[in-house]
Amino acid sequence: ALPIYLQVNKVRQAVPMFDLIHSVDSRKLLDEIEKVATKHDKVQDVLLQVNVAREASKTGMSVEEFPDIRDYAKTLPHVRVRGLMCMAPFFDDPEEARPIFRVANALYEDMKGYFEEGQIQYLSMGMTHDFEVALEEGANIVRVGTAIFGERVYY
């Protein structure tokens, strides 16, 4: 399964292709995933993306929006929430991301009480520069593309 940030207008193409969508951050996106997954007779696994750090440059719902969207997602028969995703800001010292990862882990652990036992399994947080701290704080999915492929080249 590949992680992607999903725009509403791309749901139609993404749902048949992806096992797990990592970037669900709104009711609007949930509604579109539900509609397309229904047409494909599929239950689409998703991670709810929370912008714990409140960074304007990052997507994701606010911590305050999280309970409402989490509860709404639970009502959709063709959407299955599997966990949480968050991205910390880039810090020169990865330790500075630790408080953000702790909040995300607390939300993740709390989620487990709202869904069927065993349904919430994934905490996706941490990237090449801070994945070790993320793992220490409970991540079980990390994004380390830069470590594998090198820096992105923009043309």
Task: Annotate the PLM regions.
Residues 135-155:
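C-terminal helical cap(s) of enzyme catalytic domains, especially alpha/beta-barrels
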Residues 1-131, 135-137:
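Conserved alpha/beta-domain cores
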